[in-house]
């Protein structure tokens, strides 16, 4: 990646090869991670909670909104400040790399059935989904859209990505830009209020919650008309909700 940033000839061809090696290693360990975690009672099948890689403002907001609907979450981040803020807000959080070999073994994944990779690093997000696909299954590993993929110059091979959240793919850069402009995570009743705000560019739907069951919204999903929709809301929309 450093070679690519310095525009060294052939660097762009090496990135997929590097990812093949790294992900191949992760998959080998991953084949054991799921069965071991379930045997130890650390992970369960068919549960609704979410492991969130990243403890930034949006990740904490999502975890807080999910908690208000009775959905369990666990935040994991290497940044002590972000983890401390999560704990201070009453959210379960661990200071740990989601890519650590011991992560699937040491994290208490009881009640957790899916992953959201929500860090600022595209490569970490892709590698996290590769590691946890054997714990949760291919359909239950989600991530933000890689910035370079959205721009048409992916450094992460698309076949290694988890399921990208957002009816329109959401990048970390988009989330960061909006939170710096006062956007905040909000939970809104499904229906015309949400659909109108989304159409006006004032709301980014991310999660649907119905009767305590959550589902990430992905490409081309319809905006829910029932339950609650959790997403990032612009200041004018937040004012109308208050």
Task: Indicate residue ranges for each PLM-predicted region.
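Cytosolic regulatory regions of ion transport systems
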Residues: 2-242
């Amino acid at each position: 990646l450093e070679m690519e940033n310095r525009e060294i000839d052939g660097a762009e061809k090496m990135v997929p090869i590097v990812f093949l090696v790294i992900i191949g290693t992760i998959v080998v360990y991953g084949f054991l991670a799921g069965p071991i975690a379930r045997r130890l009672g650390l992970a369960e099948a068919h549960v609704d909670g979410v492991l969130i890689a990243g403890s930034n403002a949006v990740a904490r907001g999502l975890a807080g909104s999910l908690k208000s609907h009775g959905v369990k979450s666990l935040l994991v981040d290497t940044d002590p400040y972000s983890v401390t803020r999560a704990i201070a807000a009453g959210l379960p959080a661990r200071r740990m790399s989601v890519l650590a070999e011991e992560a699937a073994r040491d994290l208490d994944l009881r009640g957790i059935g899916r992953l959201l990779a929500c860090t600022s690093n595209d490569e970490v997000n892709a590698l996290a989904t590769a590691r946890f696909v054997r714990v949760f299954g291919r359909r239950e590993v989600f991530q933000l859209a890689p910035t370079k993929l959205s721009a048409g110059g992916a450094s992460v091979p698309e076949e290694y990505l988890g399921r990208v959240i957002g009816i329109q793919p959401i990048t970390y850069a988009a989330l960061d830009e909006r939170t710096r402009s006062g956007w905040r995570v909000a939970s809104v009743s499904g229906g015309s209020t949400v659909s109108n705000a989304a159409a006006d560019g004032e709301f980014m739907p991310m999660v649907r919650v119905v009767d305590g069951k959550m589902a990430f919204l992905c490409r081309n999903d319809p905006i829910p008309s029932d339950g609650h929709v959790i997403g990032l809301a612009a200041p004018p929309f937040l004012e109308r909700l208050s």
